[in-house]
Regions:
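Beta-strand-rich recognition/accessory modules
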Residues: 1-23, 30, 40, 111-117, ...
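Extended, loop-rich substrate-binding clefts of extracytoplasmic carbohydrate-active enzymes
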Residues: 4, 9, 77-134
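Acidic-aromatic substrate-binding/catalytic surfaces of carbohydrate-active enzymes
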Residues: 20-80
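Asparagine-centered strand-capping/turn motif at beta-strand->loop junctions
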Residues: 27, 141-147, 286
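Hydrophobic small-molecule pocket/channel-lining residues, especially in calycin-type beta-barrels
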Residues: 31, 41-43, 53, 116-123, ...
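Short, hydrophobic/aromatic beta-strand segments
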Residues: 36-38, 149-155, 293-295
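Beta-rich strand-turn-strand
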Residues: 133-136, 147
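Active-site/ligand-binding surface loops and adjacent short beta/alpha elements
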Residues: 150-152, 156, 160-235
Length: 306
């Protein structure tokens, strides 16, 4: 399938992905960042801040930023690393991944530059395949060590999900797990046995998480299902009102209509020897949520009954 590369008015080239059922996605070369994913009813499923700065070298608030080679401030580099602030290239040799002929996809690559080597002196190739199929968006990141010595890194795909009202959202699949609370100097806690709900700022890294997490939007009767491999942690973030007002690239009230649930490898950095490659995978899909006695039953989603 030929690539639909568009040069938009904001000056940021992007690849448009479409598939027969009518869903679509947009992927910027800047940051290798997915900035739109719409379902077959043309409803936007990803959150994008109305104040997002679409101008390098700023990071873009929304969509699915790629955090590499550092997540957050866990290191000496800029917040969340530099991959989200670099212009990627189309990857004409994406082997050894199998062909994605049966779906709409794009392969991108980011290689270390002389400028990056000054701040992170490690030679690498970061590849990302974004694939769109009916009701599903799949991202496959790969990192290859092209250096002469081993290196380690942390990584995350930050999923800004569009929700109707954060106070009506709950997350299933992270119950009873340990997490680091970034609002408490990364102190370690154990989550309660109930689903996660939101009534204030949340910034947590959940550890050793399952491969499937459900994000249930009561008001829209829609459930996001996040499946992931190679990224054992999950980051859950919402800035709430005070933090949102302090963010220059986010409107004061927009925290109500977004939630970040990230696929991440944070607690234990990934170590690659020369010429070794790491591969992750994340799959986002949506299902209609059914009510029972006024409550959604995400257990069916988590057990794969949908």
């Amino acid at each position: 399938m030929p690539l639909n590369l568009v040069h938009a008015s904001d000056g940021l080239p992007r690849v448009l992905l479409t598939e027969p059922s009518g869903s679509s996605a947009e992927v910027l070369l800047y940051g290798g960042q997915v900035v739109s994913w719409k379902n077959d009813r043309r409803e936007e499923l990803l959150f994008m801040s109305s104040k997002a700065i679409l101008k390098p070298p700023k990071a873009i608030r929304g969509g699915i930023p790629v955090c590499f080679p550092q997540f957050g401030n866990l290191g000496s580099l800029e917040q969340h690393g530099f991959a989200r602030n670099r212009v990627w290239s189309l990857d004409n040799n994406p082997s050894p991944l199998p062909s994605a002929d049966n779906q709409s996809s794009v392969d991108l690559i980011l290689k270390s530059t002389e400028e990056d080597l000054k701040t992170w002196p490690r030679s690498f190739e970061l590849r990302l395949r974004v694939s769109l199929s009916a009701g599903k968006l799949t991202l496959i990141p790969r990192v290859r060590n092209t250096d002469s010595k081993a290196f380690s890194f942390t990584f995350a795909l930050t999923n800004y999900l569009s929700v109707s009202d954060i106070s009506e959202v709950r997350v299933e699949g992270l119950e009873t797990l340990d997490y680091f609370d970034n609002l408490m100097q990364r102190e370690r806690f154990t989550e309660q046995a109930d689903a996660i709900t939101f009534d204030g700022e949340t910034d947590r890294v959940y550890l050793s998480t399952p491969t499937k997490i459900a994000i249930i939007d009561h008001e829209k009767k829609r459930t996001f299902v996040l499946r992931k491999d190679g990224m054992p942690d999950a980051v859950v973030w919402n800035p709430w009102d005070k933090k949102a007002k302090a963010l220059s690239d986010m409107s004061d009230e927009e925290y109500k209509t977004m939630l970040c649930v990230d696929s991440a490898a944070v607690e234990t950095p990934i170590v690659l020897k020369p010429f070794e490659e790491w591969k992750g995978r994340q799959e986002l899909s949506t299902v209609s949520s059914s009510y029972y006695s006024g409550q959604l039953d995400p257990r069916k989603v988590l057990r794969g009954f949908h």
